[in-house]
Design a protein with these regions (language model features):
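Donor nucleotide-sugar binding/catalytic pocket of nucleotide-sugar-dependent glycosyltransferases
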Residues: 97-145, 207
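Conserved acidic donor-binding segment of nucleotide-sugar-dependent glycosyltransferases
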Residues: 263-264, 268-275, 283-289
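Short hydrophobic beta-strand element within catalytic cores of glycosyltransferases
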Residues: 248-251
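Aromatic "clamp/platform" in nucleotide-sugar-dependent glycosyltransferases that forms part
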Residues: 231
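Conserved donor-binding/catalytic core segment of Leloir-type glycosyltransferases
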Residues: 147-168, 174-177
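Nucleotide-activated donor-binding/catalytic signature segment of Leloir-type glycosyltransferases, i.e.
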Residues: 196-211
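Short alpha-helical donor nucleotide-sugar binding micro-motif in glycosyltransferases
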Residues: 210-211, 218-223
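A short, histidine- and acid-enriched strand-loop-helix "catalytic/donor-clamping" loop
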Residues: 72-89, 102-105
Length: 320
């Protein structure tokens, strides 16, 4: 059996998924021009073609399916918030109503979204957007000396990780943190057009800029609470990254990664329009943190394990 997966380019949060797909015989191809797809299919005669979302690639594959005899499976990042009307655009909303009818399968990151698709279209596989703990956990342990070296304070660290843009709703976090500034250190990891405004709002916060590789991993060992306050967020892979490192999370209900949160266990959910709700969540989680925490490898707080999920997904796909 021959399978081809197409994506527009390397996607860091899909790194482990694509690696295991490749090991399972699904060839991953990046940035193939739409005009070259049919010639590839003519030459290689795949049995299954994996496409991103409801993209032009998906439409090309569906139009060509009868000619080449392959099945079409989409990787879709829809969240329940998007399904309920908070979409990034009308084109995706329209495509969601039509294209799933014609797909042979669709891979979704949320159990609730999967149920929604199954109830309306009779199809849907589940695979959360998480990394492989067998790869990441040893790396977190390896960078512990760097974590200890760059630790800025003994106080608990509350952090945001991502782009400084409007949809991330960072000003709400800064205002919500204000009553807690004597109890914790706020760290903003990232950059973007809103940085000058944010720096003027929070002179007490630590701004690191974008971080990559070991330095980014080292900070995850230090973060006690990660906050994702977005008003619109298809997923938010940083939630899973933080939980895998043992940090607790405060996540907007409008983020797709809210599905990873188990309230009372690994985090707290809030309405991103309710700044007091953010403060309340932070206060609640601060009370649960041990005092004088050593910088050490912590328990993985993710509710799912990559190996279990990917093996279940491959079994379901192979039944098509």
């Amino acid at each position: 059996m021959s399978d081809l997966l197409y994506t527009n380019g390397p996607v860091p949060y899909r790194e482990d998924l694509f690696r295991v797909f490749h090991e399972a015989g699904i060839e991953v191809r990046f940035g193939v021009p739409a005009g070259d797809l049919r010639s590839e299919w003519e030459r290689e005669r795949p049995d299954r073609v994996f496409v991103p979302e409801f993209s032009a690639m998906a439409l090309t594959a569906l139009r060509s399916r009868k000619r080449f005899g392959f099945k079409v499976i989409s990787l879709c990042d829809d969240s329940m918030d998007m399904i309920c009307g908070n979409d990034f655009g009308w084109k995706h909303r329209l495509a969601r109503r039509v294209i799933p009818h014609y797909l042979d399968g669709i891979i979704l990151h949320s159990p609730d979204v999967r149920l929604w698709y199954q109830s309306r279209f009779g199809k849907g596989f589940f695979m959360p957007i998480i990394a492989d703990e067998r790869r990441v956990r040893p790396e977190l342990e390896r960078v512990l000396p760097l974590s200890r070296q760059i630790r800025p304070t003994e106080k608990p660290i509350i952090a945001f990780v991502g782009r400084f843009v409007g949809l991330k709703n960072i000003p709400a976090l800064l205002r919500a943190f204000e009553p807690l500034r004597n109890r914790a250190q706020l760290v903003l990891i990232g950059d973007g057009p809103e940085r000058p405004v944010l720096e003027s709002m929070a002179p007490h916060a630590l701004f690191t800029g974008f971080l990559f590789g070991d330095e980014r991993l080292a900070w995850y060992n230090l973060i006690d609470i990660l906050v994702l306050p977005s008003t619109q967020e298809a997923y938010g892979a940083v939630t899973g990254e933080a939980l895998m490192a043992g940090a607790k999370v405060v996540v907007s209900r409008q983020a797709g990664s809210s599905d990873l949160v188990r309230e009372g266990e690994n985090g707290c959910l809030f309405d991103p329009m309710d700044e007091k709700g953010i403060t309340d969540c932070l206060e609640k989680l601060l009370e649960t943190l041990p005092s004088g925490r050593p910088v050490a490898l912590r328990e993985n707080l993710l509710p799912y394990r990559f190996e279990t999920c990917i093996q279940d997904l491959l079994k379901e796909i192979n039944l098509l």
